[in-house]
Amino acid sequence: MTFSVDKVRADFPVLSREVNGLPLAYLDSAASAQKPSQVIDSEAEFYRHGYAAVHRGIHTLSAQATEKMENVRKRASLFINARSAEELVFVRGTTEGINLVANSWGNSNVRAGDNIIISQMEHHANIVPWQMLCARVGAELRVIPLNPDGTLQLETLPTLFDEKTRLLAITHVSNVLGTENPLAEMITLAHQHGAKVLVDGAQAVMHHPVHVQALDCDFYVFSGHKLYGPTGIGILYVKEALLQEMPPWEGGGSMIATVSLSEGTTWTKAPWRFEAGTPNTGGIIGLGAALEYVSALGLNSIAEYEQNLMHYALSQLESVPDLTLYGPQNRLGVIAFNLGKHHAYDVGSFLDNYGIAVRTGHHCAMPLMAYYNVPAMCRASLAMYNTHEEVDRLVTGLQRIHRLLG
């Protein structure tokens, strides 16, 4: 199937609107992607004509809603090439997925004197849960340092592992730098030391195919809203044998086998024992539509288009005076930058006046900001619906801001 950005854009209603009297150039998909009509319509249709509580209902609407929900689990397992749909837990998003692992697997397997390895480029969602776990149990948090070019100092990684290392928690793609980490060699090294590996895939799954079996990671987590799906829904993948050993994190309905006031409670099997309470069924339906939409376009075709657009953007940005780019030349999805000595908020505000939406701030990556000794950065992210013309508008806008602010 030939990729057509014009056809893709026609599926996204918001891209036809104007901001400040100018066509919207939405360059903030790394924060949250826009939604195609297919996703919006699927969720609306469910609420209009198919809504019911899932599980245990004997009536038609409940049975159909349950079947739709479980079909999305199957579709998601195929999307990331898992061995079984029962290795996937529905979560609110990447943050909840990581916290689930920290509070279930982590509380059961990490002890005083143990250590966990993360990197200096992590999103706070892959830092704070491990800090909290280490504080609870008396474990140590070790950090893979950054290089100035935005890659990790991988030569230090073997020195961080020892017999007390329980987990490597690493991002697949940096949400600030666009760096894609060499997961295969990192996962192999971790397993050689008996450690498990969690991969934060929030910034990866929309840009190219992911094969969790080939990666051999123990945990992989991502959000739906960055993948053109709804907010409030995501996927946590856990190897089946590992998942069946993990205790539940939250208690309530749907995750039990039996409840007795005198004899206590027993749990249902995984993955359902990690899905306490009424699920976000509408969000799950929308996620399924997003997976179907992206799969129909073809992730390889999307990757080819986006990489060509990224190369064009990096080339054109070289013409902007006093522009500092952060991250490696080979990157996925995002371009972080600062313009001269001007604060990122000021630059972002000017760009918004030109109808261009970028993200400004620390991007939930304060340790990374500290490494580069800046309080904030601007970040333009490129998605499958962005165009060369929008890149040109970004470049022209930055050139104009430089002239205005000096």
UniProtKB/Swiss-Prot annotation:
Co-factor(s): pyridoxal 5'-phosphate
Subunit structure: Homodimer. Interacts with SufE and the SufBCD complex composed of SufB, SufC and SufD. The interaction with SufE is required to mediate the direct transfer of the sulfur atom from the S-sulfanylcysteine.
Catalytic activity, reaction form: (sulfur carrier)-H + L-cysteine = (sulfur carrier)-SH + L-alanine; L-selenocysteine + AH2 = hydrogenselenide + L-alanine + A + H(+)
Subcellular location: Cytoplasm
HAMAP family tied to this protein: SufS_aminotrans_5 (MF_01831)
EC number per UniProt: 2.8.1.7, 4.4.1.16
Family classification: Belongs to the class-V pyridoxal-phosphate-dependent aminotransferase family. Csd subfamily.
The species this protein was found in: Escherichia coli O139:H28 (strain E24377A / ETEC)
Encoding gene per record: sufS
Single Gene Ontology MF annotation: pyridoxal phosphate binding
Annotated SUPFAM superfamilies: PLP-dependent transferases (SSF53383)
Taxonomic lineage from the root: Bacteria, Pseudomonadati, Pseudomonadota, Gammaproteobacteria, Enterobacterales
The name this protein goes by in its record: Cysteine desulfurase
Keyword Signal: no
Any Gene Ontology CC annotation: cytoplasm
GO biological process: cysteine metabolic process
Keyword tags: Cytoplasm, Lyase, Pyridoxal phosphate, Transferase
